[in-house]
């Protein structure tokens, strides 16, 4: 939409920490979702939420058809779309913010352009081109798993330069509950519940 995208502006889609820690200089944001991807805690973090010796787990997006190759597909419901937040960066800051994000997402992520939608069932995107960073399955940091208990054990105990791994998960779950009446993510909410259960046992 032209009214939403002045010439030279940059739109960025956040599906993880960008939702509550948005890029600098944004002047507008939209709750929205992208189609054809699932969100999973399948990327090792050796910097922000863990260390080289004790990596944490952070998010990536997996194309739906690729996700079907992994074992958690057989018993995990597929929610249409991945909810997050799109942020508009004015043209005069676009290059600066792109460089900032390239550096922030350096650990195994690549940049892609995707359409985003405002409501479940929409056929026409609210934005045609939105920048998103995806940790692909070819990344050495990619670590698929269907073991929720083991994933929760990692997330509940790891810490990196950006803080505790479990805070990353809890902040995401909180944001998803408030983004939109339509926003949900079964994987995130089930993992959050398991982490809270494990942390309660250790207190």
From Swiss-Prot:
Keyword Nucleus tagged: yes
Q: Which UniProt keywords apply?
A: Cytoplasm, Lyase, Nucleus
**Pfam families named in the record:** ChaC
Reactions catalysed according to its record: glutathione = L-cysteinylglycine + 5-oxo-L-proline
Q: Quick one: a GO cellular component term? A: nucleus
Domain of life of the organism encoding this protein: Eukaryota
* InterPro entries assigned to the protein according to its UniProt record, in alphabetical order: ChaC, GGCT-like, GGCT-like_sf
Annotated residues for binding of substrate: 12-17
Enzyme Commission code(s) on record: 4.3.2.7
Q: Which family does the similarity line name?
A: Belongs to the gamma-glutamylcyclotransferase family. ChaC subfamily.
What function does the entry list? Gamma-glutamylcyclotransferase acting specifically on glutathione, but not on other gamma-glutamyl peptides. Allows utilization of gluthathione through subsequent cleavage of the Cys-Gly dipeptide by Cys-Gly metallodipeptidase dug1.
Q: What is this protein called?
A: Glutathione-specific gamma-glutamylcyclotransferase
Taxonomy of the source species: Eukaryota, Fungi, Dikarya, Ascomycota, Taphrinomycotina
């Amino acid at each position: 939409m032209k009214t939403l995208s002045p010439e030279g502006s940059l739109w960025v889609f956040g599906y993880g920490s960008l939702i509550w820690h948005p890029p600098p200089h944004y002047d507008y944001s939209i709750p929205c979702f992208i189609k054809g991807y699932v969100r999973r805690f399948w990327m090792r973090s050796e910097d922000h939420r863990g260390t080289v010796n004790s990596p944490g787990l952070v998010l990536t997006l997996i194309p739906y058809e690729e996700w079907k190759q992994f074992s958690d597909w057989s018993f995990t419901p597929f929610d249409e779309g991945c909810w997050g937040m799109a942020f508009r960066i004015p043209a005069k800051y676009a290059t600066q913010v792109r460089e900032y994000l390239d550096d922030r997402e350096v650990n195994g992520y690549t940049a892609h352009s995707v359409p985003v939608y405002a409501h479940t069932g929409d056929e026409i995107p609210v934005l045609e081109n939105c920048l998103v960073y995806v940790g692909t399955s070819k990344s050495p940091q990619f670590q698929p798993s269907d073991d929720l208990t083991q994933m929760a054990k990692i997330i509940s105990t790891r810490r990196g330069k950006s803080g505790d791994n479990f805070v990353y998960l809890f902040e995401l779950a909180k944001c998803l509950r408030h983004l939109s009446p339509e926003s949900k993510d079964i994987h995130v909410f089930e993992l959050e519940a398991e982490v809270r259960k494990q942390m309660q046992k250790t207190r």
